[in-house]
Amino acid sequence: MAFQKARALQEAEKLVSQGKSAQAIKQYQEILDKDPADVSLLNTVGDLYIRDRNVPEGLKQFQKLAEAYVREGFNVKAIAIYRKISKLDTNSVDTLLKLAELYQLQGLSREAR
C-alpha cells in the first residue's frame, strides 16, 4: 500500500487532539521515516515531548531541526529554534555559541554578545 502522507498527518493531529501524545509522536515519527525532508515535523514532535515532560527527547528533536535549518541556509529559522532550545536548557554553552555564530552571520552583532 502506498504511503498517504495527508491521511497519516490527519491521524497524528487527531491523536494530539485526543490527548494521546505518545501515539501521536509515533505517528509523526513514521511520517518522518517515510519523508525525512519534512523537517518541520521535528518541531511538532519536540513540542509533544516537552508537553509530556520529556525535555531531553524534545531537545533532541529541536536540535535536529535547527541543524537541518542551518544546512538548508535558513539561518533565521535556525536562530528561532536555538532560542527555543536555550530557554529549555539554560546551561547549554553549545547552544549559546551556535546562536552567537548565527547572529554574526545575519549581521546581528549586538545579539551575538
Please annotate each region the language model reported.
Residues 1-113:
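Repeat-based scaffolding regions
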